[in-house]
Amino acid sequence: MRTRRAAIALLIAILALPVAAQRRVPKDLSGTRGFNYQSAETIGHAEFWLQYNPAVTERDLDYAKRLQLNQVRVFVPYAAWVRNKEAFRKNLLHFVRAAHERGIGVMPTMQYKFGEWKDKKAWPNSREFVADLVATIGKEPGLEIWDVENEPECCSLPPSPDNLLHMEHARYMARMFHELDPVTPVTIGATFVENMIAMGDAVDVLSFHNYSPTRAQIRANIAKAKQYAAQTGKPLIDTEIGCIARANPYDVTLQEHMQAHVGWYIWELMITGNWGTVHGVFYPDGTVRDPSIVAALLGFFRNRGENVVESVPDRENHVTDAVTKNRKWLAEAHPDWDTGLDLAEISANLIEAAQLAPMHNLPSRQVILMRNGQPDIAALRSLLEKFTAVLAPYRLPAGDPRHSRPPGFIQ
């Protein structure tokens, strides 16, 4: 009897708490290792949901799990929901549960009816959409945070009048989510730290984006965000980082955020038909754009210090040997196709292993494509000439001390 009375008393006490006190707000998000997501096979967030493929989702989440990622930010468009609400609910539920099974929490990021933010009278129209989302996944253990609006102030600093109206809409939506879901915390994905601060009182979790082009600027934005988070006592995350076209390399920005102990979400996991030219880690088959990104996600970074060991690809005369054999093949009137391919492969491997050329179009890839095609001696000759020109400057003259083991080597 005493146990039952105690349980009833506890329940009454919980119900008496203000709604904000019931909200499941994390104290610290510095351990967040997240990613933005849509499938590589689709273009745009609406198409992702309209052509949703559970097997593809599970494949990609398995890639994320292998990288020890623990959060996913996925856009949830009104346009996909309104087309087929029943299918959308089913697919969203599958996504959240599939992520949760892999230890990955979900941050749904809202996309409302196009242009609706411009008309205040239309703002309440989103209530049915939001209520349906809450009813569908609001009690799922895999749901972590609602991102009620992405970059409402994109992309002006200070905000333009339109930006300010859009930011007001984001605040309105934060209140709506707070009303309809008294448990799950909300955030707004701000483009700039300054605008995150301006909207900070409307959210439970502070979120900013950081595509800054220098380490100093990355650090300054992080410091400003951390200072405001400390003042308010609210947890902080950066929900978008990493872009090869904005001088914001993944390994650089990841290193800065990790060293600052700020949780992050890369944009994005997959190399997609939308942003794939400048973002993304994985191709659908599990191959990657750049292994340095994978290493950085796991906390391993390039040595950019004074103690870098110089690569000496000709230490054992393999570069000299390759250049000699290449030139001999090139001088033949009727060279052998297979022999030339082998020479090209050896040259490509030397170039890649010592990083002697840009890696955006791998030398080994060029050889593989040539092997898979029809014999074309002229094309192979051109490729081998190019590789030989790269290798030739790295030949060591006879007697160069770099041919030898370093001083102090113990036999």
Predicted feature residues:
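Long, charged/polar, soluble alpha-helical segments
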Residues: 315-411
